[in-house]
């Protein structure tokens, strides 16, 4: 028996940051090394995401238990993977894909396959005595490592908050800095400044699922203006040090072919009108990135949005592409969007996640590695962002340990690698 051989795999039900069950998996090697990873969980999900398997037993965790998925790991997946070398990531992942045999992993559950896939990578890195980011880099021959620009979600609306704001996330991107640690400091200072701005206006400073504030505001635009006020208070310059980013999550307010902004008196827009509305915001404010500006099924609308904004800012497909190489390829062919959000639980294995990242890179699309609104202390996405030189990471606000765990891991990686922080150079139209 060789030391890198998988001798056991164990999964358990743990809790995520919302108090809902999720899966944690351990991959155990002959050498005694144990790799551990947890699957995250989303709130606003794309309809073509790989399936997160839940038990549906209302008497237990309100139907959200994951015992079935845990059992799939402890029996079917374990039986198929024990005896394999942990260094064969592609073989491990492909075995699970074949075992499942469905397009969206509905048999085993993407939460089951992902936890095992990531735990195997962690075990492999530990067995080689190298950091996880280095192991991920070596999987695809990535020789240059970079620190990602953080996309920090500081005001929440939509399905991430119980307020009257339609756009789901208002974010800051600290682009005008020479290191990740300085960029992080700027983000934290602006976050605290925003709290005082909201306090002075008598607005709520409770935080949402991802640690951003969720005040009731008069309009979506007011969220932008309070953030600009907070940036100004800290002495940083919006438009040079700090850029803004939006995640519309517009599938959440797309009804019968129209985009309906409930927070603005149920104002209804056609696809092109909503694109023009977004273009108006871009002209008026220092916005460098818009995610899911239109519904995931509105390919024609996306085409128009890309034609008017695609050479000016980053247009990120999340619900649109769901980290799926096949769907991304369609986007590339039809010139839709210019960036992809990478959420590995949308696809269910590390190998397929890397396929999506490198397909995007090879076709000039930027990549943003992302958390989910239901997270754990697992910080794998930090290593993934550096190990693929993705360029950007989206992992929430500057509070809640489920978010900060990723930022802290990035600080450790920066200290270890001295990897470059490219800031503005990551964006079209900013260099």
Swiss-Prot record:
Coiled coil: none annotated. GO terms for cellular component: cell surface; extracellular region; phosphopyruvate hydratase complex. InterPro entries: Enolase, Enolase-like_C_sf, Enolase-like_N, Enolase_C, Enolase_CS, Enolase_N. Binds a second Mg(2+) ion via substrate during catalysis. SMART domains: Enolase_C (SM01192), Enolase_N (SM01193). Transmembrane segments: none annotated. GO terms for molecular function: magnesium ion binding; phosphopyruvate hydratase activity. Mg(2+) binds at residues 247, 291, 318. The active site is at residues 210, 343. It is found in: Cytoplasm; Secreted; Cell surface. (2R)-2-phosphoglycerate binds at residues 168, 343, 372-373, 394. Its cofactor is Mg(2+). Keywords: Cytoplasm, Glycolysis, Lyase, Magnesium, Metal-binding, Secreted. Pathway: Carbohydrate degradation; glycolysis; pyruvate from D-glyceraldehyde 3-phosphate: step 4/5. Its EC number is 4.2.1.11. It holds the Pfam family Enolase_N. It catalyses: (2R)-2-phosphoglycerate = phosphoenolpyruvate + H2O. Component of the RNA degradosome, a multiprotein complex involved in RNA processing and mRNA degradation. Belongs to the enolase family. Catalyzes the reversible conversion of 2-phosphoglycerate (2-PG) into phosphoenolpyruvate (PEP). It is essential for the degradation of carbohydrates via glycolysis. This is Enolase. It comes from Acinetobacter baylyi (strain ATCC 33305 / BD413 / ADP1). The gene is eno.
């Amino acid at each position: 028996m060789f030391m890198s051989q998988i001798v056991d795999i164990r999964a358990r039900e743990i809790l995520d940051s919302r108090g809902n069950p999720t899966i944690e998996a351990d991959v155990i090697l002959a050498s005694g090394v144990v790799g551990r990873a947890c699957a995250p969980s989303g709130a606003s999900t794309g309809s073509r995401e790989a399936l997160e398997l839940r038990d549906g037993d209302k008497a237990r965790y309100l139907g959200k238990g994951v015992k079935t998925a845990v059992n799939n790991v402890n029996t079917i997946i374990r039986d198929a993977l024990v005896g394999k070398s942990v260094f064969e990531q592609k073989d491990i992942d492909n075995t699970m894909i074949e075992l499942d045999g469905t397009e969206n992993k509905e048999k085993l559950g993407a939460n089951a396959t992902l936890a095992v896939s990531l735990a195997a990578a962690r075990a492999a890195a530990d067995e080689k005595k190298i950091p996880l980011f280095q192991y991920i880099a070596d999987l695809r021959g990535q020789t240059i490592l970079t620190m990602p620009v953080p996309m920090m979600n500081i005001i929440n609306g939509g399905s991430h908050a119980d307020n009257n704001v339609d756009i789901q996330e208002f974010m800051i991107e600290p682009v005008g800095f020479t290191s990740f640690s300085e960029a992080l400091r700027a983000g934290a200072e602006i976050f605290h400044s925003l709290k005082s701005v909201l306090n002075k206006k008598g607005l709520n400073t409770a935080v949402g699922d991802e640690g951003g504030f969720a005040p009731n505001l008069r309009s979506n635009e007011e969220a932008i203006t309070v953030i600009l006020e907070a940036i100004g208070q800290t002495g940083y310059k919006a438009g040079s040090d700090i850029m803004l980013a939006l995640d519309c999550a517009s599938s959440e307010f797309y009804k019968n072919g129209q985009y309906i902004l409930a927070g603005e008196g149920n104002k209804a827009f056609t696809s092109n009108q909503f694109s023009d509305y977004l273009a108006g915001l871009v002209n008026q404010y220092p916005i460098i990135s818009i995610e899911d500006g239109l519904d995931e099924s509105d390919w024609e609308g996306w085409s128009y949005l890309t034609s008017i904004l695609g050479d000016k800012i980053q247009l990120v497909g999340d619900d649109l592409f769901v980290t799926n190489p096949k769907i991304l390829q369609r986007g590339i062919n039809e010139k839709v969007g210019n960036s992809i959000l990478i959420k590995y639980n949308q696809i269910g294995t590390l190998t397929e996640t890397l396929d999506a990242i490198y397909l995007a890179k090879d076709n000039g699309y930027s990549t943003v590695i992302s958390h989910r609104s239901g997270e754990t202390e697992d910080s794998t996405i930090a290593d993934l962002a550096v190990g693929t030189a993705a360029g950007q990471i989206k992992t929430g606000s500057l509070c809640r340990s489920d978010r900060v765990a990723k930022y802290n891991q990035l600080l450790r990686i920066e200290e270890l690698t001295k990897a470059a922080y490219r800031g503005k150079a990551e964006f079209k139209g900013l260099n």
